[in-house]
Amino acid sequence: MLPAPTGSDSGRAPRSLRGMSDQPHPPIVEFAFPGPLRDTLVAAILDGTKTSTTSTLVEYSIEDEPLPVVGTRQTVVDSDDSAVAVIETTSVEVAPLASVDLQHAVDEGEGYTSVAEWRAAHERYWQGEAMRAWLGDEHFTVDDTTMVVLERFRLVEIL
């Protein structure tokens, strides 16, 4: 996927890392568009507070990308496109937006203290101008029935 949005951190964009070293790296994953949000999310991954992420299912279908698979490793990049960490997917669930629970919201590492707070932030992101432009749908909205991909991961290595 393009550096597009996953949850308020949307933008899971696996691609290969070339020319960064002689050792092979797992595919790249990008959290959000480059900028302050991505930098915040990457910092939360590096300090261990971010261990989950959420994407709309439509993000995967737009890019014709398969869903994450448990055990898959990905290289996290920062806003400068520098490889900073390797994460490993530990669980994947596709569910309606209304079913996201507090633990998943908290584990996104953005300081959410309620599902309502998490959802409001994610709705702003998913219904924001950048996401709508990326999706090619200026009227894109989410509701309780919108299918989302709930992914959990662990930090494997800081690069």
Q: Where does each model-flagged region fall?
A:
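Mixed-charge, low-complexity intrinsically disordered regions
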Residues: M1-V86, V92-L159
